[in-house]
């Protein structure tokens, strides 16, 4: 691969950066969000041109999805170097040069010798076809087609660099299979990703050589044999008779592990940004204190992931209508909630920052791997030699995937902690228990089932966080005595990402439920205040003979009661004597009566005598007004509009409510939470959440707000 800054020598080494640490550091320049935006852009490219050195995670994720419009093209400039290495192998064998995998046996039996190079490659593919598929099309022992497509793309890219001794025509054939959405069937298990992903990759070779046991999946999902696969792909020259080294070139690489790792990391990076935005929305609906995002706090900690996470949250919360309202509430009653928010909110930048750094570092490691030459031996045409080494060892994959999985589990743990606060009326600052949205809390248990499911998801996710790479077994007659387990780790990380999508779905729908409940709360509170004010004016202002009554001074304090009491603590039966509203209103009237002094002895000026009249009038009027306000909300005609429309987080809410067609969940509705979750989950899996997510941050300049 060429030196990134152009400062190279004849041997292909970078003079200024011979160990590539500089290039690795340079790759991490800029914000994580900008990198995610770049990935998304690459994911949407119509054409992916492969040359061996510039393949990206986003491109692999695009091709992995068979429904993608992205087409793969091979850089014609690679043809000459690929041919040169292939010619070198043939020339070397004709001269009788001894070379591993060309004239020798494999692995621990490389002491064996043969001059039948083609037959040796044929046998290699045969004995590596050791996978188990089971019976039936729906067998769970087949690698998903998306992973196979990713592996095919990565393997082409590696072989294009011209160090592997394979014909260009074989790479063109694999490309045709990709572009025509014809996917070889590979076994799910059976590789330790050292020497590369031998067993699964041998099934791609099996299709190319027309092995009778080889199967592929057609564009319509039907299972087909190798002949039909070639026909559908438009490959007309017949099956390949492998030349010396070509079988080894096809199978001895890390493409399956690194291909899957790429698709996993594409999702992981997006989910990491989503978790940052979730934390900001969580702050909004919980009436939190945005002080936790102040740049000085995070600047003094120095960690870039933390600094960026805080800056992203700060941007979402800056100017938020919810934060303006929360500030007024905190000023009205500083003791209504703790001085500091709980850790799930207040330390969310410190928690998410290291996870973002890990995921970002893993992404860069995998991008180096997918652009590497990772087979053995390597053909160095310029020095006229075959180099025997171990680039097939997929340790970067195993380690990166283990680390990513741990980061994913930590993100999930934070989501669970935040969700647990959100649904708990002891912690959620006035929202109803279980986020129940119906009129009767005794017949509406909201997100109770969802909270149980979240606990299940989180538990499984924490289990998956355990490492894979410490379970290595010595293999192949103790020749492969250390091995990376890269694909196994990538598969487990794919599972973890899937579970995090389930958690993200549940949490996002819960956040939108909370947003709607805050909207309902604000309208109900306004209605209660207006009604109490009107009743107070009618009942408390005047005496029997029309004279001004001392109880008229109670109105202001009665309104303060409404400001301080959580609406959902009483609104299902607002005039119940067992609920806090009526108790506090009566307490205010009693306190005023006790301060009324001698006037209480006069029936015309007694405040005590007004209490029953006030309560009786309120019982007649308030329930009707509350119901009218709720009906107006349900009809979309509320007097006060939803504050979310004035917030930077609005695109996500709009997406969930309008694009996926969900609405407020109530016990009065037949629709279950799971039905709504499915809509959002499918949208996330289809990638439709990406644009609304990035829209939330489209005007962020990549820097924290100035310290003032």
UniProtKB/Swiss-Prot annotation:
Q: Where would you say this protein principally sits, based on its record?
A: cytoplasm
Organism domain of life: Eukaryota
Q: Does the keyword DNA repair apply?
A: no
Query: Could you tell me which pathway this protein works in?
Result: Alkaloid biosynthesis; Phenylpropanoid metabolism; trans-cinnamate biosynthesis; trans-cinnamate from L-phenylalanine: step 1/1
Assigned GO CC terms: cytoplasm
Annotated catalysed reactions: L-phenylalanine = (E)-cinnamate + NH4(+)
The UniProt record lists the 5-imidazolinone (Ala-Gly) crosslink at 194-196
Summarize what the UniProt record says about post-translational modification. Contains an active site 4-methylidene-imidazol-5-one (MIO), which is formed autocatalytically by cyclization and dehydration of residues Ala-Ser-Gly.
**Which Gene Ontology MF annotations are present?**
phenylalanine ammonia-lyase activity
The kind of enzyme this is, by top-level EC class, is: lyase
Name of the protein = Phenylalanine ammonia-lyase 1
Organism of provenance: Narcissus pseudonarcissus
